């Protein structure tokens, strides 16, 4: 039996809160360090815990998607982040979006009410901080925006660090949207049917003018000591546009499934606006994360039909993201190879996304809690969403890159299927493996596990090769809207 009576967790974001709650409920005395409100990163502004920065969407809630499947696994394992998300969700079609203020408030209330957690609101600028010395385990869950001091301390321990940029989409006031042009509706919805998004249609001339202005707009320059690398799922809109004039039309601006009520025809492009809160007083411009200068953002995005008078509640911005080369520096239990007392959790490990970060922190908490009970918790199989994500952190590659949950991380199906059948079969197989893992690992689900419901799932899963290597072809990692 491993002796873990005290733990110090640096960072009270999604991963840190998940891990802290697991350990506290296992009887560990947890000190949870959070530098807000004494200090804020360039992208944070809310003093509450679990603040969502890049978007208020946790992406698809459909279990026939990688992230939707991961959400279901987390719900069954008792995730506090999923509890908060389900309690504060706002309409967003097939996606799970939340009122981000209520979401953070929910998580903060749960953490503050947990008797086993002591919340210390101060910055930990070094892994040599005296407050960490007496802890049996130290968990670094500082997120993608770890402070300079902590980043330097971690870099010294792992031999270096990498940077890339996450870009934030602008948010505009609802009352400034011209509803004689923008219309409510979801992709493939019936004409006139109210949907979860507002949609701004563009004809060819309007799109071409917007595209040229976007390419010519002045951007915030990168610092000369930072290497710029973009993760596909949060790429700045201007960087995506540089790939070619039609990239946006086949990407975030794709018009498929929409009819412009003014013309009765499909527009050349569609820009979607997603509600930021339950009252729908503000909307973010979906897929338009950007590093344009503020004045340029106003000039360019007001070219979108319906947004000529847009009032910017928050401009888009860019922030640094820090992560380690997990296969090289982390052991399978997420401890540092250089110091087995120090563990990493969340986005700093190389998982990408809100849900994935929370899942990572949740899993680490489960692993350490099991050790207190004298057992090693087996990792879920790679056919599951959680197992595939953890396998990504363990698989050595020449150029390790962050990844979100997607079916491309899983072993191949091992049989030929039509494209439309592929995702339901991956999901059905994952459900079968996850339920079996729960029983074999002795993990009691918090809610009744959802069993496979795909047509012919029982026959298909029996024919699937479960020993295959990780598929080389990955599904697109960018969030699917509407």
Swiss-Prot record:
Cell compartments where the protein resides: Cytoplasm
Family: Belongs to the MnmG family. TrmFO subfamily.
Tree of life domain: Bacteria
Cofactor(s) annotated in UniProt: FAD
Keyword Transferase included in the entry's annotation: yes
Listed InterPro entries: FAD/NAD-bd_sf (IPR036188), MnmG-rel (IPR002218), MnmG_N (IPR040131), TrmFO (IPR004417)
Cellular compartments per GO CC: cytosol
Entry protein name: Methylenetetrahydrofolate--tRNA-(uracil-5-)-methyltransferase TrmFO
GO-annotated molecular function: flavin adenine dinucleotide binding; tRNA (uracil(54)-C5)-methyltransferase activity, 5,10-methylenetetrahydrofolate-dependent
Reaction(s) the record says it catalyses: uridine(54) in tRNA + (6R)-5,10-methylene-5,6,7,8-tetrahydrofolate + NADH + H(+) = 5-methyluridine(54) in tRNA + (6S)-5,6,7,8-tetrahydrofolate + NAD(+); uridine(54) in tRNA + (6R)-5,10-methylene-5,6,7,8-tetrahydrofolate + NADPH + H(+) = 5-methyluridine(54) in tRNA + (6S)-5,6,7,8-tetrahydrofolate + NADP(+)
Lineage of the species this protein comes from: Bacteria, Pseudomonadati, Thermodesulfobacteriota, Desulfovibrionia, Desulfovibrionales
Pfam family, any one: GIDA
Disulfide linkage: none
EC number: 2.1.1.74
Keywords: Cytoplasm, FAD, Flavoprotein, Methyltransferase, NAD, NADP, Transferase, tRNA processing
Species in which this protein is naturally found: Nitratidesulfovibrio vulgaris (strain DP4)
GO BP terms, alphabetized: tRNA methylation; tRNA wobble uridine modification
First-level EC class: transferase
Gene3D superfamilies xrefs: FAD/NAD(P)-binding domain (3.50.50.60)
Main location: cytoplasm
KW RNA-binding (keyword) present: no
NCBIfam families xrefs: gid_trmFO, PRK05335.1
Residue numbers binding FAD: 11-16
Summary of the function given for this chain in its UniProt record: Catalyzes the folate-dependent formation of 5-methyl-uridine at position 54 (M-5-U54) in all tRNAs.
